[in-house]
Amino acid sequence: MSKDIKDIKKDILDQFRAMEGEENDILPENWLIEEYLPFLNPYEKKDFEKAIKQLAAKGFLKYEKGVIPKLKLTEKGANLIH
């Protein structure tokens, strides 16, 4: 079953939750490149970009664009997952 943007946002926040993320914690690159992104189809990979932009627009995380995006939890994001 294909993931939509909502599912991808939930996956990202769930991963921060699983690592008991606090403000300024960064999602481990190895999780993204080894355990998550390889399992997304091309459409889901496009939605991944949209999902992180939406999470950033809502103030839940900050991200630096790159081959592997750097996702950093904000205070608002930390409050959401706890």
Range-by-range predicted roles:
Residues 22-39:
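Short acidic, hydrophobic short linear motifs in intrinsically disordered regions
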Residues 56-66:
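A short, conserved structural fragment
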Residues 41-57:
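Short amphipathic alpha-helical interaction segments
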Residues 76-82:
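Short, amphipathic alpha-helical interaction segments positioned at domain boundaries
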Residues 68-73:
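Minor-groove-contacting beta-hairpin "wing" of winged helix-turn-helix DNA-binding domains
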Residues 1-23:
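Short alpha-helical segments that sit at the start of domains
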Residues 5, 25, 44, 66:
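Residue-level marker of regulatory loop/turn positions in helix-turn-helix DNA-binding domains and
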